[in-house]
């Protein structure tokens, strides 16, 4: 006796509403675009897309000892999931320790956008330790105090919850492709 299973053909993944192209500037912010690290490319599936930038905005009237303006910094990452749910996108708590972060706290925060709408984001407070470049006699590290906000965008829903993101993603892929 045999059994035949009829499975639908896998269709193309629906296009995302997320704009992956980052601007060069936004108000006082300068976007210095960067590529995904080899570790990110190795850890995530090949069809995962990245848009990344280090964004700097000089603080008015705040100068370093060398006379340069002191900037505020935002590390911006947009990661667009590929077809493999398990190896294409994940919550930052999974990869931040490999990037030198020690996560000190995690909480939910409301983010209000210019339209007046709001949604919940995850807020992580961490310390990132990075080796100082150019130091030859001994290893020297500098610590950065970081705040990370993240959320996941589905077809028509936003969530800051990993399980919620997985369920939204599965529903969107079944219904919308």
Question: Which residue stretches match the model-derived regions?
Answer:
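Short extracytoplasmic
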Residues: 21-57
């Amino acid at each position: 006796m045999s059994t035949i299973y009829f499975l639908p053909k896998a269709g193309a993944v629906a296009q995302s509403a997320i704009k992956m192209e980052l601007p060069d500037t936004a108000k006082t912010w300068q976007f210095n675009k960067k590529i995904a690290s080899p570790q990110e490319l190795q850890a995530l599936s090949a069809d995962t897309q990245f848009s990344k930038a280090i964004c700097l905005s000089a603080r008015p009237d705040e100068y370093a000892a060398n006379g340069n303006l002191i900037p505020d910094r935002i590390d911006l990452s947009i990661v667009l999931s590929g077809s493999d749910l398990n190896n294409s996108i994940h919550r930052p708590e999974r990869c931040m320790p490999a990037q030198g972060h020690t996560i000190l706290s995690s909480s939910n925060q409301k983010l209000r956008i210019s339209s007046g709408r709001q949604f919940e984001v995850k807020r992580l407070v961490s310390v990132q330790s990075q080796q100082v470049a150019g130091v030859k006699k001994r290893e020297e590290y500098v610590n950065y105090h970081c705040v990370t906000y993240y959320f996941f965008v589905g077809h028509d829903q936003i969530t800051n919850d990993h399980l919620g993101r997985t369920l939204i993603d599965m529903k969107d892929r079944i219904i919308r492709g």
